[in-house]
Amino acid sequence: MRKLTILFDADDVAENLCDCWIEMLNERYGTSVTLEDVQNWDMTKAFPTLTKEQVFDVLHTDEIWKRITPLPGAVEVLQKLHNEGHELYMVTASDYRTCKPKVDRLLELFPFLDWKHIIITNNKQMVRGDILIDDGPHNLVGGDYFKILFDRPHNHSFDAASTGILRLYTWEEIYFAIQTYIYTVLHTTEDFYGD
């Protein structure tokens, strides 16, 4: 069986950045915003009393990256895929000021990865792989890979089904979808061509 190149996003797919971001803003400014209040990509809309600078400044602190933790099932599923021999690449869009603390923390949380398996880009469609798992519809549309949208409150308004994108809710579902993809797409093609 051919091994896959699996691309996956970091923030709000592998780890809980949005939760930590909201928590830090609530602590700093006495607000009471919840994850469900963030209904789109513009975090400032969930914090209308704060300036854009106040909302985004916390991302440039080391503290936020120390707080992030893996989303449920992420480490286990990614470790399993790694053990099965698939190539894993964490593909993330990051401000240059956050790269080092962010990547250092991600490598702590996902010790089976190293720097060679972290790709930092704002244009994920330029990265080649078999599968991309992301919470940003804009990262999936137009890419040349099997597309999995990781469900988060900020992407609920996106109609994934109408664009041929698979919306999934847990890492366990993602693992099952990848196994199904291997069997139905790759296995059938290998049988046909005799690979």
Where are these regions (language model features)?
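Substrate-recognition element of Asp-dependent hydrolases with the DxDx(T/V) motif
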Residues: 65, 69, 74-106
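Structural recognition of alpha->loop->beta junctions
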Residues: 105-121, 163-179
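Conserved Lys-Pro-Asp/Glu-containing loop-to-beta segment of HAD-superfamily phosphomonoesterases
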Residues: 119-144
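Acidic, Mg2+-coordinating phosphoryl-transfer loop and its flanking beta/alpha structural elements
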Residues: 135-170
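Active-site neighborhood of HAD-like aspartate-dependent phosphohydrolases
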Residues: 1-54
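Short, basic/glycine-rich phosphate-binding loops at helix/coil junctions
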Residues: 46-61, 85-88
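A short acidic, often aromatic-flanked loop/helix-cap motif at beta-alpha or helix-coil junctions
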Residues: 41, 123-129, 155-157, 171-177
